[in-house]
Amino acid sequence: MNNIVIVGLQWGDEGKGKIVDYLSENADVVVRFQGGNNAGHTIVVDDEVYKLNLLPSAVLRPGKISIIGNGVALDSHALISEIESLKVKGVDVNYNNLMVSESCPLILSVHKDKEKLFEDLNGNHKIGTTNKGIGPCYEDKVGRRAIRLCDLENADELNKRLDTLLNYHNAIRKGLNYQVVKKEEILKEIQEISEKILSYKKPVWKILNDLMKEGKKIIFEGAQGAFLDIDHGTYPFVTSSNTVASQAITGSGLSSNAYIIGVVKAYTTRVGNGPFPTEQKNEVGDSLFTIGKELGTVSNRRRRCGWFDAVLVRQAVQLSGVSSIVLTKLDVLNSFDTIKICTGYKYSGKMYDYLPASHSIQGELEPIYEEFPGWKENTQGKRSIETLPINLIKYIEGLEKLIGVPIHLISTSPKREDVIKLKDF
């Protein structure tokens, strides 16, 4: 099991960062393969809280290699700022333990401008983006006009590519009576950061293939969650990249078999707009929000909260070929008398055992629940299966039966050490 892919199976915020950090103790390399600094991974080490956006979670472990793959939309200024903030805390990030793909498309100020502009134009139909410029950056990548990290080394090439990029963006800005951008402004923006960021530039695909031949253990760290996937998520309320496990190949350049682990919360949360069948707009939702401290790591927005959706997670398991589940934030459910799990949907007299693709149907689905008795016992910080209440064990067994794959690990607090291994991988 030299290669592991770790992905979220809900709408993100499942606790992937902690799990990657935990498993990376026995790995050599951790790779980010999609998304951008719209992702937020929170890790607690010795009571110190680290909030990572672009950097792989292994950056907190000495001796590990962290890699940002070509599938990541790269905000160079944000990355350098994140590196410098970690150095202040004593974390060593250097050109030997962090490598960035030379093919990464760069997020520029024009991308952030465009995202905000179109979100404002959408009015009441906003997607609810983080306004980090990720979507417009991916649009330019697909449109073959993106500035990539490798372009910064060649002034002539950079100038040509900037002309192409700004012809497109300024045409849109003129049409919307928005001030055009001068090339000199973008050049200055790039030149401010180019020397620092180019120091990390590497042919990541080649390095990963060489590391694999050496027998190194590699973890691929997903961002967001399965139902934010541009193809398989609750479209159009999705992110702009593929978040399922298969993207690990495309977004890194390493084609190899891997063991796939899915991370889920013991309940469900979602940031921003979009369908959410098990959302609880009541005391249950308020309790989950308060106890779970459900504020977005990046956006600081309140996360919507609801019961665990086994239909959704089972579908995500199948989309990513998941072999194993890690269950997080079980301790948030400690005080509940009764806990519900969604086992199916009802819409217009028809039963569904999957999430239909139609947005109009998704928003009208009526969840069907199975109830489980709560355990009414403090489980926060538990580290052995023998200390767990019987009703919590029954809840886990119920989830396994509904999802169709085993739960191997559970997390009982944000701290690195508070993990219980239920079964061997």
UniProtKB/Swiss-Prot annotation:
GTP binds at residues 12-18, 40-42, 303, 329-331, 411-413. Substrate binds at residues 297-303. CDD domains: AdSS (cd03108). This is Adenylosuccinate synthetase. Pathway: Purine metabolism; AMP biosynthesis via de novo pathway; AMP from IMP: step 1/2. Gene3D superfamilies: Adenylosuccinate Synthetase, subunit A, domain 1, Adenylosuccinate Synthetase, subunit A, domain 2, Adenylosuccinate Synthetase, subunit A, domain 3. GO terms for molecular function: adenylosuccinate synthase activity; GTP binding; magnesium ion binding. It catalyses: IMP + L-aspartate + GTP = N(6)-(1,2-dicarboxyethyl)-AMP + GDP + phosphate + 2 H(+). It is an enzyme of class 6 (ligase). Mg(2+) binds at residues 13, 40. The keyword Nucleotide-binding applies. Belongs to the adenylosuccinate synthetase family. Keywords: Cytoplasm, GTP-binding, Ligase, Magnesium, Metal-binding, Nucleotide-binding, Purine biosynthesis. It is found in: Cytoplasm. InterPro entries: Adenylosuccin_syn_GTP-bd, Adenylosuccin_syn_Lys_AS, Adenylosuccinate_synth_dom1, Adenylosuccinate_synth_dom2, Adenylosuccinate_synth_dom3, Adenylosuccinate_synthetase, P-loop_NTPase. Its EC number is 6.3.4.4. It comes from Wolbachia sp. subsp. Drosophila simulans (strain wRi). One of its GO terms (biological process) is IMP metabolic process. SMART domains: Adenylsucc_synt. The keyword Cytoplasm applies. GO terms for cellular component: cytoplasm. IMP binds at residues 13-16, 38-41, 130, 144, 224, 239, 301. Binds 1 Mg(2+) ion per subunit. Its cofactor is Mg(2+). Plays an important role in the de novo pathway of purine nucleotide biosynthesis. Catalyzes the first committed step in the biosynthesis of AMP from IMP.
